[in-house]
């Protein structure tokens, strides 16, 4: 068995017929599969035991040898080797073909590799392969040139003979005509009869002349064709070819079908062809040069590898092992079989028929037809449907060929190699478990017992409850009470993994410590719902059990939910109290200023005293009271100690202090860590998130998790105690609404009248009505807002951020306002009613479209977003942190603060996503003093300090400037946003980046918006815009950018409009044609800079790269992607987007190859380009020149060095064809390649540096160990007391342990 850990690379190549025969264990000669009576495989058939191995372990076909003791014997009666049946999964057979066939991948793929190699158009190639034209495979030029004069003389003689024969025939016919006419005259025939006879004769004579002319023309044609005949000429005219062969057959060879190509490939001189192509590339131009470059790629692929071009034409076809194309008996006695068996059967039938026809010496036309059918059968076997109509099975379903077995989601790569099913897993519905701690989950007993069965059985045997595993198993199945006690013991501290599909980011799988619960539902902690995006309306989750000690350690340390409080996308907490908890804490911390509350203005000596008053009903939670807080409590931020009286000592940090606050807030502060500053304000969702963020930044994870649990418990408790309910009476429609609507209705009528009088156009009327009613809606909303009492439960829900927003409130209690129609245009008639008042039929009807569109959009978005994530993962999967520091001195200058209008320096809005969590690239020095040294992590605290010192921008390390050869380095990446510490070596940051960008994809909108005013000016937004940017497509309605700095001139004719830029340096002016409707951003005579946008719209990233360079396109792409996510309120750190953009700019297009071994126009990895140039320069040669290439993520994934990764992504057959011809080696650097071949991935703990660890005690530890044991403590047996003779071990008395 091949061990995956013993090889470092995997090569793919072209298999020749000899290779196929070498793999094979025998030839399949018959199309039969199994004998339907005995159900045993037919001899020499597709399931033959002699070829593929026995169907039963250690048993031959005829039954002579049974049992393992005959292992390896080949039965002399039936020829079957006695071995395991599983060899039928690995042994191959072959079919010897009676005529060679071409491999469809190399002939029909785009571009056609065979066509490129032989310089034949695919159409011509098809004619030869499918017997529609002859191909000349050999011409004896020397002999032809030598014999040309004699042959020409021979042809002239023949031509003369034809002419002579024609002349004599014509003469004879003329004589006969004279005789006939003389006879008719003598008989006195009429002139009419004589004319008919003459016409008949003339007709015959014309026929004779024409026939002779045709023969002469044919002879000339054959002669001309022969004179100019060269190798690889095609001849589609069967008769002409036959004549050529009959006359000059000794001077050339020609044939049809794959045999012709085979002969041609055997005599094909690769070196000579490569030299010729290089010459064309050096001297040629345009189309000719491009074609030569493409052809040279294929030719040099064969030259530089051990591949032979003959491998593209096959003499025999491999037959894959029978267990990979099984045949199973169904209930009704019928059989279900793999489609491959049908395809193989067609090949064998046609092959056998062809053999028979050849033996019989059948006519060429029949044999050629059979050969063509054989070629088509092999094509269908390799790739059904690639050429012509696919072969169909019952019910007109195309049969699945070998290529289809690999392709697509159900193919071998994606279904079986990248997605495997796992043992020790369970699945059930989830319910909430509010009593759980953050790191716990509730597992149903039945499920836990099944999952932990082996552990439970072992423990039962260890504790002597059962004698052996078998009886332990019986105990478990019968459900004895002791089993559950043992189960409790076994699951303690053994984490399980919970996963909810779809797993959009790494927080979709987390580890928990299981707690046994009754019932059949899994219980999960309410705070992890956000990470899983789970709710309790019937969601299901899967449980997986880590078995090995290493797996358990990884689950506990890396995946435990209490260690995954931060979101990898932006480094902010994801485990946040929501909904009921927010409402409870809001209720707890509100101020009772607006209510009639008990106990206002009282003073208490301690919180306990205040609680006593509350329990006695003397005090309300929301009353403003004075409470003295004990020693150690930290006062609120910004609190000033009261003025002290004479003789009193000054207040010190840590002393007791009095504070005017509420009991609710005092209780809230007891939930937080002791040394956290007192929170003396209303805590809604926003404030809560700031507090949790602060905790995550400043406290250890244990404390954060405990605090979150406290907040959860208190939130639920006080939400219940608050008695918040929703009743129809809580929805208060403002009194002023009628008046407001009436006022705007009058304005509406006024506009309508203006339109009817023809004073305004239809469009203007629509715009004005929309403006009027938008204003009306907003005014009603404001009136409604002011009208709601602060104690109103619905208002409290919205105000605290627990659920809902003001827009929904407006629709419930104000008015619904304007809605849009199916064309996405706003209907100028508003819905004046609110849901509380009820909608009229028309109002209801026009509002249905929006609601339905919302649902349809969501469904579409989910699929598109998933596909985007898949492409992102594929392009970035091999970006792994490979080293501590790449040592670069480059970095990015980023703004951290800007001055407002009031001159005060404030943090910029995007600091969170741009500068936060990066490393400083250089010291920050002010007045000669270092405020922040280089290589230090920019956290919230440090950024605040820098802003305080007046620093506006800093130079930080970035992935875009990282100089690591493979992957990236820890310093350029900076802090791992998921852990809050510097990223570890081995972290798969590429995949995390892809998940962070893809996960919120579903929240992005689908539609393309119409901008107000300009009709038809589509701006792509939301998800399609993100896809457009990452695929590096030219955007719709692209805005040109100036290629030089200079003056602008706008030229406009009746039909066209263009902007002309006259450069300052006097070079040629550039014209940019634009549409008449485009909004121009520059004015006549204005001065523009290089790269300045000339019209409104999106710029083409390829132009930005060409004109402004690599750095500019990186900034442009990051900014544009962030714009889309920011518009939806999604926070993603720039570094994730930078990783993807780095992958898009990884390649260089070679312009001039110099002395390097690179082809012009070739796309190469930047690292390869630099290495090759370094080598050339060292040898004193001329380096290659190239320009950076921006590739879309799909193209970049397919262009990866790893053929395994590319083949498992998309266009499997094309990638494999290419890889095989180039004999590509996969050095197994990325993640996918290693998953496919079953190795541990080279990331995280799969890295060899973590895998090969041995624990060695230090010298001090050894010394400490030995010093602890004194000499006297060691029990040595005295020497010389034994008998000195050896005792056999069986007889030795071991004492009581031997029982």
From Swiss-Prot:
GO CC annotations on file: DNA-directed RNA polymerase complex
Pfam families the record matches: RNA_pol_Rpb1_1, RNA_pol_Rpb1_2, RNA_pol_Rpb1_3, RNA_pol_Rpb1_4, RNA_pol_Rpb1_5
UniProt remark on cofactor binding: Binds 1 Mg(2+) ion per subunit. Binds 2 Zn(2+) ions per subunit.
Region (Disordered): 385-405
Keyword tags: DNA-directed RNA polymerase, Magnesium, Metal-binding, Nucleotidyltransferase, Transcription, Transferase, Zinc
Gene Ontology terms describing biological process: DNA-templated transcription
Enzyme Commission number: 2.7.7.6
Class of enzymatic activity (EC top level): transferase
Record-stated family: Belongs to the RNA polymerase beta' chain family.
Job of this protein: DNA-dependent RNA polymerase catalyzes the transcription of DNA into RNA using the four ribonucleoside triphosphates as substrates.
Oligomer and partners: The RNAP catalytic core consists of 2 alpha, 1 beta, 1 beta' and 1 omega subunit. When a sigma factor is associated with the core the holoenzyme is formed, which can initiate transcription.
Protein name: DNA-directed RNA polymerase subunit beta'
Organism: Streptomyces avermitilis (strain ATCC 31267 / DSM 46492 / JCM 5070 / NBRC 14893 / NCIMB 12804 / NRRL 8165 / MA-4680)
């Amino acid at each position: 068995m091949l061990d995956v850990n013993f090889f470092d690379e995997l090569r793919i190549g072209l298999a020749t017929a000899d290779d196929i025969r070498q793999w094979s264990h025998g030839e399949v000669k018959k199309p039969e599969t199994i004998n339907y009576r005995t159900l045993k495989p037919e001899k020499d058939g597709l399931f033959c035991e002699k070829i593929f191995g026995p169907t039963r372990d250690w048993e031959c076909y005829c039954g002579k040898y049974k049992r393992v003791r005959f292992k390896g014997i080949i039965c002399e009666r039936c020829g079957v080797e006695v071995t395991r049946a599983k060899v039928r999964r690995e042994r191959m057979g072959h079919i010897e073909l009676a005529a060679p066939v071409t491999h469809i991948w190399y002939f029909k793929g785009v571009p056609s590799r065979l066509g490129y190699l032989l310089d034949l158009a695919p159409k011509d190639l098809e004619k030869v392969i499918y017997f529609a034209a002859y191909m000349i495979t050999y011409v004896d030029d020397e002999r032809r040139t030598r014999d040309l004069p004699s042959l020409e003389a021979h042809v002239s003689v023949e031509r003369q003979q034809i002419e002579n024969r024609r002349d004599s025939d014509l003469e004879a016919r003329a004589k006969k005509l004279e005789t006939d006419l003389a006879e008719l005259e003598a008989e006195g025939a009429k002139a009419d009869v004589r004319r008919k006879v003459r016409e008949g004769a003339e007709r015959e004579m014309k026929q004779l002349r024409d026939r002779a002319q045709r023969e002469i023309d044919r002879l000339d044609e054959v002669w001309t064709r022969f004179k100019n005949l060269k190798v690889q000429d095609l001849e589609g005219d069967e008769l002409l070819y036959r004549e050529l062969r009959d006359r000059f057959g000794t001077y050339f060879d020609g044939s049809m079908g794959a045999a012709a190509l085979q002969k041609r490939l055997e005599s094909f001189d690769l070196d000579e062809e490569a030299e010729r192509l290089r010459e064309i590339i050096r001297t040629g131009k345009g189309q000719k040069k491009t074609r030569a470059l493409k052809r040279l790629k294929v030719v040099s692929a064969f030259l530089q590898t051990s591949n032979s071009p003959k491998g593209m034409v096959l003499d025999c076809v491999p037959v894959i092992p029978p267990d990979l194309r099984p045949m199973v008996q169904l209930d009704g006695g019928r059989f279900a079989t793999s489609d491959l068996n049908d395809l193989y059967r067609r090949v064998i039938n046609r092959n056998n028929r062809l053999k028979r026809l050849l033996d019989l010496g059948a006519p060429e036309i029949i044999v050629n037809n059979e050969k063509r059918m054989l070629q088509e059968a092999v094509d269908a076997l390799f790739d059904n449907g690639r050429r012509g109509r696919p072969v169909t099975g019952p019910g007109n379903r195309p049969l699945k060929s070998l290529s289809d077995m690999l392709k697509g989601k159900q193919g071998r790569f994606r279904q079986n190699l990248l997605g495997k099913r796992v043992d020790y897993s369970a699945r059930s519905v989830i319910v909430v478990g509010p009593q759980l701690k953050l790191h716990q989950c509730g597992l149903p007993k039945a499920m836990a017992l099944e999952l932990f069965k082996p552990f439970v059985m072992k423990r039962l045997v260890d504790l002597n409850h059962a004698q052996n595993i078998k009886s332990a198993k019986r105990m478990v199945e019968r459900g004895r009470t002791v089993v559950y006690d043992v189960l409790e013991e076994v699951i303690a501290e053994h984490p399980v993994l919970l996963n909810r599909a779809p797993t959009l980011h790494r927080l979709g799988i987390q580890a928990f410590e299981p707690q046994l619960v009754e019932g059949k539902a899994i219980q999960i902690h309410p705070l992890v719902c956000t990470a899983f995006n789970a709710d309790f309306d019937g969601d299901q989750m899967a449980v997986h059990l880590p078995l090995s000690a290493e797996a358990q350690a990884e689950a506990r340390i890396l995946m435990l939910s209490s260690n995954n409080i931060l979101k990898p996308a932006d480094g902010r907490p994801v485990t946040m109290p929501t909904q009921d908890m927010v409402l409870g804490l809001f209720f707890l911390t509100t101020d009772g200023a607006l209510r009639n509350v008990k106990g206002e203005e009282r003073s208490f000596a301690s919180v306990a005293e205040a609680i006593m008053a509350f329990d006695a009903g003397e005090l309300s939670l929301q009353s403003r009271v004075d409470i003295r807080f004990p020693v150690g409590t930290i006062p609120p931020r910004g609190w000033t100690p009261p003025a002290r009286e004479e003789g009193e000592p000054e207040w010190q940090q840590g002393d007791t202090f009095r504070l005017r606050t509420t009991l609710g807030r005092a209780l809230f502060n007891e939930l937080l860590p002791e040394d956290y500053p007192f929170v003396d304000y209303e805590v809604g969702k926003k404030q809560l998130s700031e507090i949790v963020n602060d905790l995550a930044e400043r406290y250890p994870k244990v404390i954060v998790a405990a605090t979150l649990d406290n907040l959860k418990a208190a939130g639920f408790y006080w939400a219940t105690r608050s008695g918040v309910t929703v009743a129809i009476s809580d929805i208060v429609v403002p009194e002023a609404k009628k008046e407001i609507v009436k006022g705007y209705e009058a304005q509406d009528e006024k506009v309508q009248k203006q339109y009817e009088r023809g004073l305004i156009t239809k469009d203007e009327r629509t715009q004005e009505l929309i403006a009027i009613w938008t204003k009306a809606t907003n005014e009603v909303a404001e009136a409604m807002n002011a009208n709601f009492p602060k104690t109103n439960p619905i208002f409290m829900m919205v105000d605290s951020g627990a659920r809902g927003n003001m827009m929904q409130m407006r629709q419930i209690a104000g008015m619904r306002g304007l809605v849009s129609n199916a064309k996405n245009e706003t209907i100028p008639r508003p819905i004046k009613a609110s849901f509380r008042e009820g909608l009229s039929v028309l109002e209801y009807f026009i509002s249905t479209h929006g609601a339905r569109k919302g649902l349809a959009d969501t469904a579409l978005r989910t699929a598109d977003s998933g596909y985007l994530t898949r492409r992102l993962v594929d392009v970035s999967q091999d970006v792994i942190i490979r080293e501590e520091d790449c040592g670069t001195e480059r970095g990015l200058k980023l703004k951290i603060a800007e001055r407002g209008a009031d001159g005060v320096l404030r943090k910029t809005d995007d600091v969170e996503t741009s500068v936060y969590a990066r490393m400083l690239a250089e010291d920050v020095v002010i007045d000669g003093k270092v405020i922040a040294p280089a290589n230090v992590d920019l956290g919230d605290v440090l950024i605040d300090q820098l802003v305080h010192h007046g620093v506006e921008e800093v130079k930080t390390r970035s992935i875009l400037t990282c100089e690591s050869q493979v992957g990236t380095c820890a310093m350029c990446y900076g802090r791992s946003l998921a852990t809050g510490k510097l990223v570890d070596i081995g972290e798969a940051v590429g995949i995390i980046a892809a998940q962070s960008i893809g996960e919120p994809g579903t929240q992005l909108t689908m539609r393309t918006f119409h901008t107000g005013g300009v009709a038809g000016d589509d701006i792509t937004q939301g998800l399609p815009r993100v896809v457009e940017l990452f695929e590096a497509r030219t955007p719709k309605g692209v805005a040109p950018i100036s290629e030089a700095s200079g003056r602008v001139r706008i030229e406009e004719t009746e039909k066209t409009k263009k902007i002309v830029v006259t450069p300052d340096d006097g070079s040629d002016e550039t014209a940019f044609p634009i549409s008449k409707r485009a909004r121009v951003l520059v004015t006549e005579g204005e001065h523009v800079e290089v790269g300045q946008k000339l019209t409104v719209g999106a710029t083409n990233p390829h132009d930005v790269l060409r004109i402004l360079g690599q750095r500019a396109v990186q900034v442009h792409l990051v900014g544009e992607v962030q714009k889309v996510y920011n518009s939806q309120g999604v926070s993603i750190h720039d570094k994730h987007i930078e990783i993807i953009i780095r992958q898009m700019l990884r390649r260089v297009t070679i312009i001039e190859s110099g002395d390097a071994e690179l082809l012009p126009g070739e796309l190469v990895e930047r690292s390869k380009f630099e290495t090759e140039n370094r080598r050339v320069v060292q040898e004193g040669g001329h380096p290659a020149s190239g320009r950076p290439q921006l590739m879309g993520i799909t193209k970049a994934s397919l262009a990866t060095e790893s053929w395994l990764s590319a083949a498992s992504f998309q266009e499997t057959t094309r990638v494999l064809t290419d890889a095989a011809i180039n004999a590509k080696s996969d050095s197994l650097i990325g993640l996918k390649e290693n998953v496919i071949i079953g190795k541990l991935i080279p990331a995280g703990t799969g890295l060899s540096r973590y895998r090969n660890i041995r624990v060695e005690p230090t010298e001090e530890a050894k010394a400490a160990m030995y010093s602890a044991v004194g000499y006297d403590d060691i029990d040595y047996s005295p020497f010389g007391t034994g008998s000195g003779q050896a005792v056999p071990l069986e007889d030795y008395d071991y004492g009581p342990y031997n029982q």
